[in-house]
From Swiss-Prot:
SMART domains: CYCLIN (SM00385). InterPro entries: Cyclin-like_dom, Cyclin-like_sf, Cyclin/Ssn8, Cyclin_C_2, Cyclin_N. Pfam families: Cyclin_C_2, Cyclin_N. One of its GO terms (molecular function) is cyclin-dependent protein serine/threonine kinase regulator activity. It comes from Anopheles gambiae. Residues 47-151 form the Cyclin N-terminal domain. GO terms for biological process: positive regulation of transcription by RNA polymerase II. This is Cyclin-C. Keywords: Activator, Cyclin, Nucleus, Repressor, Transcription, Transcription regulation. Component of the Cdk8 module of the Mediator complex. Belongs to the cyclin family. Cyclin C subfamily. Gene3D superfamilies: Cyclin-like. It comes from the Eukaryota.
Amino acid sequence: MAGNFWQSSHHQQWILDKQDLIRERQHDLKTLSEEEYQKLFMFFANIIQVLGEQLKLRQQVIATATVYFKRFYARNSLKCIDPLLLAPTCILLSSKVEEFGVISNSRLITTCQTVIKNKFSYAYQQEFPYRTNHILECEFYLLENLDCCLIVYQPYRPLLQLMQDIGQEEQLLTLTWRLINDSLRTDVSLLYPPYQIAIGCLQIACVILQKELKSWFAELNVDMDKVQEIARAIVNLFELWKGYDEKKEIQALLEKMPKPKPHPQR
């Protein structure tokens, strides 16, 4: 995973243009507002996070699964595959790619059933409807849509390198790490290289903790306009969170969301 980002498929194929991203979403944005669309993706990122934690996965594995999820819908409408099926499929694939070890299919399904029942019953009245065969079929479509570009570079490694330069700042590291996790609920992982995301999150953390590192930031060889765009996207996420009660709103959003056509009954 420590290979060259600039020569990777992540850089060459999966740093997308914002206008292309908006254009690809037009079908879904006929039904949903941009804010509703983002709220749905925040919700499914939460599902991936909780599933990953229940399965005791590293944050890197959870983050990669979330990026797979976002990449799929960057090229496809929500009606192509139910996000509730794609979320655990992304976890399964990510755990293989990140060499975490194989999650047994039965354990994955059982965890999905438990998590939906115990943690997300405010969104789903029914139990988790999918079985192993659905997830394996979905994995095939996911691989196809990702063009088998499975190596995802995350901002965590560049953050650790930046922190070595700054010096021992445990509080700053912890907060920036959390902000990187939060950034997965925005589009920044689709639009910017991971080192820029790390710097954008570090900048916000410095403001929150009132750390004076302006001269250090000024010496970085980085496009600060891009860094500001990333910081703005994360601040906008916090603004959205303030007025958003997921437990009250999500059922109506899921009802409104474009859905796959059911298979004809045989």
